[in-house]
Amino acid sequence: MAIRKFKPYTPGTRQRVVTDFSEITGSKPERSLIVSKHRNKGRNNRGVITCRHRGGGHKRQYRLVDFRRDKRNINAKVAAIHYDPHRNARLALLFYEDGEKRYIIAPAGIKVGQNVISGDSVPIEDGNAMPLSVMPLGSSVHCVELYAGRGAQMVRSAGASAQLMAKEGDYVALKLPSTEVRLVRKECYATLGEVGNAEIRNTSLGKAGRTRWLGRRPQVRGSVMNPCDHPHGGGEGKAPIGRAGPVTPWGKAALGLKTRKKNKPSNNLVVRRRRRISKRSRGGRDS
C-alpha cells in the first residue's frame, strides 16, 4: 500500500493526498454482514444537539465486525480485503471451514488466501487471536479485550499496536499507542500484529468538501462569536478572550483539563499514565 499525490489541477487537488487502495480486493461488501444504521447527526432522542459539528455526509451501511474472535480452533481463509466507511482500518473477509463468513480488522501484511485461526494453542502468526498469557514478551498486538469475552475494545485504529511488556500473576502489562502502560487480565484475547493501513496518517483531505462527505460540519472559533454564544465572544476587533485561560462554550476549562474520574476503580490498573502534550506543541483550536 502506498499514498497517492495529485497534480494541482484545481485548488482541491493541490493539497490532496490519499491512499491508493491497492490492498482492496473486494468491490462490494458481503451482503450478510451489512446492516442499515440510523445516523443521529449529533442529536439525542429529543432532537437536541449534544455533539456539535456533526451532520450530512454520504450514506453508509454498517459492517458487522467480529471483535470477539470466539470461533475457536476453526481455520478461516482470507477471502478478500474490503473498505469500511466507518473506520480507517481495512476489513478482512474470512471464510471459515464450517461455512460461516465474518469480518475482522485487517492486520498489516495480511494477504488473500492466508489462513488465520483463534484459540488457546494456535501458531504465533500475525492475524491469529489468542489469550495474552500465551503470547511471547515483546509481541505487537491489536484488538485487545479489556474484559474477557466482551470483545476487543482497545487498539483498533489504523496503524495501531500495543506491546506486551511483562507478565505477572493474573495480569499482563501492555504499552498502549498513547504510551500508557496498563494491566490487563491474562485471559483476555488479542490479535497478533498491528492494524493495517498505517499510511492513513500521511493523507490529506485537500478541501473542505471532502470533510463534509465524512459527516463533519464546519467549526467556528469562539472568539469570532457574540458574547451570547461563547465566553470568548465580543469585544472590538480581534479582542483577547478576557479570561485567565480558554474555556468551552459552557464555561468549563479547556486545553489540558483532566477529564478522567479521580476515583475510577480501574485506576489501579494504570501503571503509567500517557504523556501529556504541552499546550505550545499541541497548537489547539479556540474552542
Swiss-Prot record:
The keyword RNA-binding applies. One of its GO terms (molecular function) is rRNA binding. The keyword Endoplasmic reticulum does not apply. InterPro entries: NA-bd_OB-fold, Rib_uL2_dom2, Ribosomal_uL2, Ribosomal_uL2_bac/org-type, Ribosomal_uL2_C, Ribosomal_uL2_CS, Ribosomal_uL2_dom3, Ribosomal_uL2_RNA-bd_dom. Residues 271-287 have a biased composition (Basic residues). One of its GO terms (cellular component) is large ribosomal subunit. GO terms for biological process: translation. Keywords: Ribonucleoprotein, Ribosomal protein, RNA-binding, rRNA-binding. Part of the 50S ribosomal subunit. Forms a bridge to the 30S subunit in the 70S ribosome. NCBIfam families: rplB_bact. Belongs to the universal ribosomal protein uL2 family. One of the primary rRNA binding proteins. Required for association of the 30S and 50S subunits to form the 70S ribosome, for tRNA binding and peptide bond formation. It has been suggested to have peptidyltransferase activity; this is somewhat controversial. Makes several contacts with the 16S rRNA in the 70S ribosome. This is Large ribosomal subunit protein uL2. It comes from Prochlorococcus marinus (strain MIT 9515).
